[in-house]
Amino acid sequence: NMLAGRNSNDAYITGYKHLNPIKDFHSPQRTQDVSEEIYQHLLQGKIVILDLSVGDPDQRTRLSKIIAQHIFKRSMQTFNQGEFPPNIMIYIEEAHNIIGNKDNLSDTWPRIAKEGAKFRIGTVYATQEISSVHPNILANTENMFVSHINNENEVRVLAKFYDFADFGPSLIRAQD
């Protein structure tokens, strides 16, 4: 029994401790994959808020990616069947903790940034660490609201994608 941490011979289950960090993300009451449940809510036009502010950072990143990948695949399937996928907006707070800057271009977040609009998926990501966001995502960002960037390096990273030469000094001086 996984919950007891022992097998039918009452010996400890090998590897059980490796599953402990993800125990809080599971429930015996679940009847379907949480990614599909979220997608079904989105199909109904509902707002889904997934608070992943607590827990193991690796698990938060992994779960976010799994859910985003599911949304992307389902929307792409709908589009490929000649139907219109639902309008979906994904909002990522503290994006530098979720979207890695070293992902492959075929990974979930860069693909959503590059192809998501075709499948009616928009993305809003909030971060103060622009340099930690994948460059392909920055290159495919159409609109930016920039405030409270008090680091010259972050402004330089932003300037690689957009002309912030006129605004850089004022962005650094600006305070909340």
Predicted regions span which residues?
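P-loop NTPase motor domains
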Residues: 1-114
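Conserved ATP-driven motor cores of ASCE-family P-loop NTPases powering translocation/secretion/packaging/pilus
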Residues: 112-176
